[in-house]
Swiss-Prot record:
UniProt-listed NCBIfam families: PRK13669.1
Species for this entry: Geobacillus kaustophilus (strain HTA426)
InterPro entries: DUF1450, UPF0349
One Pfam family hit: DUF1450
Family: Belongs to the UPF0349 family.
Name by which UniProt lists this protein: UPF0349 protein GK2958
Length: 78
């Protein structure tokens, strides 16, 4: 089972799209887009994704990608 990275379409429009594009190049991740992930306040404040159901954020797309990989290293699935 691969790690699941979930993005909100509103947050993609706010800037996390670049992070999603970078992560889609990794064949060891499942990337999913949703119309809304119900994190509206946080979504308006920062770039974010849900990583295996946990909120991970970053100030820039590059920082978001870095934080996602750090989260995956610190929280292995198995």
């Amino acid at each position: 089972m691969l790690p699941i990275i979930e993005f909100c379409i509103s947050n993609l429009a706010s800037g996390s799209y670049k992070a999603m594009e970078m992560l889609e190049k990794d064949p060891n991740l499942d990337i999913i887009e949703y119309s809304c992930l119900s994190y509206c306040t946080r979504c308006a404040e920062t770039l974010f994704a849900l990583v295996n159901g946990e909120f991970v954020s970053g100030e820039t797309p590059e920082q978001l990608v870095e934080n996602i990989y750090r989260h995956l290293e610190e929280n292995p699935m198995f």
